């Protein structure tokens, strides 16, 4: 069956998908992961797959470094330097310099630390500014943390339409908190243009890279960004609950060094000399002040395994080649779904234009939860995100209020045949109304 549109260079059959996967210069990277043969895994935007070497590395850390080295391994195995060493590996993926990224804590805590630091800087420079700006539909933890920071600092959190975020800048806005790629729609903001507009308006910007780091090129330095955070368990494949990372522009850390400024969670490993056990806090220099608690060594070892796969990708074209494959997979899947599932209740929510789309495709469906559960039962794993309650009188916006099916494309291991098979199963689930089976109606704690 021919499904690609006239003039399309995308595959027209499953056999063509198989051939395209065989010719893929990145195909060897899939061998770096454990992906069950009976599963089409399109949820790397929520939890990355397990790298092949992670289990052995964790066993090595547990048995040799912990079991034999015991507490000596803080020095002999370099545990104490993990936040900086692994941070440098992330820096290479996000346009940051060596020594500018620390791996620490969770994304939520790092949002709190960076947003608080940005607010503190602005309260010194422009104390009349009282607004923290973000977009409607931003990931909830970012908004919850922003509410807390606003309440603690006497500020106000203001939400604006993400499509027109730069139009919301006024002389009241102190800081913009924005996720680079929206978790629901997959819409990608222009980081350089948005940061430039913020600076022109006198605001600082905190970027959340949870849905972009490891999936597409990010250039924090080139964009002249102020602060950034991100998680380790999505496209970086660090495992469930992997540590997060934090970055601050060197101009801000230099100023914080000069003025002995602290971020609000001044834990002992963010101290300039933690093993002096001094009774008063003295912040470490640079990004190290943003470390709070003791590094979770096993979790960091797992994250490092995920990051090391990107080193294997470098001779194959690196992040640019991964992005090109991601775009092709997304374009192909959208075309397949819209061709096969026309009239079956799906509505594309992600941008059709790949230039403003991250590495996922989201579709709204009134029975989205049931549809996704039926797909998972057939071995196609994506995920579901419930729509927000629509304010009375507000126009419908499926990117905000639609129940969404999300499909993530991780070019390190996702194949074109996976996109084909997923679209085929999605059509069958919808056309047969298999999703109406009562077993698919029960909501789980994790969606």
Segments from the language model and where they lie:
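Pyridoxal 5′-phosphate
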Residues: 1-447
């Amino acid at each position: 069956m021919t499904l690609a549109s006239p003039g399309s260079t995308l595959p027209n059959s499953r056999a063509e998908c198989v051939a395209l996967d065989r010719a893929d210069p990145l195909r060897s990277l899939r061998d770096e992961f454990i992906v069950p043969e009976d599963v089409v895994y399109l949820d790397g935007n929520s939890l990355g797959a397990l790298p092949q070497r992670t289990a052995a590395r964790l066993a090595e850390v547990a048995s040799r470094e912990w079991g034999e080295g015991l507490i000596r391994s803080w020095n002999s195995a370099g545990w104490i330097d993990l936040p900086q060493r692994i941070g440098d590996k992330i820096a290479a993926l996000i346009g940051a310099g060596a020594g500018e990224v620390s791996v620490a804590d969770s994304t939520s805590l790092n949002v709190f630390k960076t947003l608080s630091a940005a607010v503190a800087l602005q309260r010194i420079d422009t104390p009349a500014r009282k607004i923290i700006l973000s977009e409607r539909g931003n990931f909830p933890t970012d908004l919850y943390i922003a509410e807390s920071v606003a309440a603690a600092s006497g500020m106000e959190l203001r939400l604006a339409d993400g499509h027109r975020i730069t139009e919301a800048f006024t002389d009241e806005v102190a800081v913009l908190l924005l996720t680079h790629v929206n978790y629901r729609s997959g819409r990608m903001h222009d980081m350089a243009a948005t940061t430039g507009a913020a600076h022109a308006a006198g605001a600082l910007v905190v970027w959340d890279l949870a849905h972009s780091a490891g999936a597409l090129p990010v250039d924090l330095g080139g964009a002249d960004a102020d602060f950034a955070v991100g998680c380790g368990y999505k496209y970086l494949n660090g495992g469930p609950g992997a540590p997060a990372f934090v970055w601050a522009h060197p101009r801000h850390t230099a100023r914080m060094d000069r003025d002995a400024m602290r971020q609000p969670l001044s834990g002992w490993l963010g101290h300039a000399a933690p093993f002096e056990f001094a009774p008063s806090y003295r912040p470490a220099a640079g990004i190290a002040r943003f470390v709070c608690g003791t590094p979770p060594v096993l979790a960091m070892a797992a994250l490092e395994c995920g990051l090391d796969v990107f080193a294997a990708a470098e001779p194959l074209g690196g992040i640019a080649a991964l992005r090109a494959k991601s775009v092709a997979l997304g374009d192909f899947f959208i075309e397949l779904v819209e061709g096969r599932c026309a009239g079956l209740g799906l509505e594309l929510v992600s941008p059709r234009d790949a230039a403003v789309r991250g590495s996922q495709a989201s579709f709204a469906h009134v029975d989205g939860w049931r549809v996704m559960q039926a797909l998972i039962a057939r071995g196609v794993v994506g995920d579901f995100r419930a729509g927000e309650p629509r304010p009375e009188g507000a126009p419908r916006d499926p990117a905000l209020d639609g129940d969404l099916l999300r499909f993530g494309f991780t070019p390190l291991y996702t194949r074109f045949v996976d996109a084909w098979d997923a679209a085929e199963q999605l059509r069958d689930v919808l056309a047969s109304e298999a999703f109406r089976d009562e077993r698919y109606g029960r909501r789980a704690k994790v969606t």
